[in-house]
């Protein structure tokens, strides 16, 4: 949790949401050196910050926020993906599972380049929503548990890892998001071959 240096108290969410938040969650997420980051919408729109951290793809999970195109200082363009989840009740587990599968695609997508595509290069990946506390944290935790079970065999343990990386307490992700994660996990575990074929 960030601290307000004027009076040494924890920042409110509103105060934190005015500042860029960008934190690594797992290095070498793809076996080829990419790092997965968690952050907020302010960070996702900060070209210098993204360039300095090697981030070339962002995934926006906020249903109510549209991110504009963004060029980096090296001439490449950030590849944007948007899967809009509601911040609280109202989502279904299949939508969250869709976000997990799309994140897997973003992480492993190649960037061969075409003449009619904006210039892009492979790089690190940022998952964000408005504040990067609930939707992003829950989606990343579920993704790591499903895609990297050898590293994160237990969902509750990976949740602690993501909370630690982001500086969250037990109130985040929100209860509705945690319930959604557990519903999605139950659906995944009922599917053929426990769904593992989808993330290989």
Which residues does each PLM region occupy?
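A phosphate-binding catalytic loop at a beta-strand-loop-alpha-helix junction
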Residues: 117-142
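Cysteine-based protein phosphatase catalytic domain of the PTP/DSP
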Residues: 18-124, 145-180
């Amino acid at each position: 949790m960030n601290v307000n240096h004027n009076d040494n108290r924890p920042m409110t969410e509103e105060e934190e949401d005015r500042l860029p938040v960008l934190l690594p969650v797992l290095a070498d997420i793809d076996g080829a050196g990419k790092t997965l980051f968690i952050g907020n919408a302010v960070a996702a729109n900060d070209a210098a910050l993204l360039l300095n951290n090697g981030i070339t793809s962002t995934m926006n999970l906020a249903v109510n926020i549209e991110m504009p195109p963004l060029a980096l200082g090296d001439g490449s363009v950030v590849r944007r993906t948007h899967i809009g989840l509601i911040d609280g009740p109202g989502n279904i587990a299949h939508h969250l599972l869709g976000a997990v599968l799309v994140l897997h695609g973003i992480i492993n997508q190649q960037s061969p380049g075409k003449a009619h595509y904006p210039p892009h290069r492979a790089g690190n990946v940022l998952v964000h929503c408005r504040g990067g506390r609930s939707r992003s944290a829950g989606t990343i935790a579920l993704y790591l548990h499903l895609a990297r079970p050898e590293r994160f065999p237990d969902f509750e343990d990976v949740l602690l890892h993501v909370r630690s990386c982001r500086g969250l307490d037990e109130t985040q992700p929100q209860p509705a998001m945690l319930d959604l994660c557990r519903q999605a996990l139950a659906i995944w575990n009922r599917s053929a071959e426990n769904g593992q074929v989808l993330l290989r």
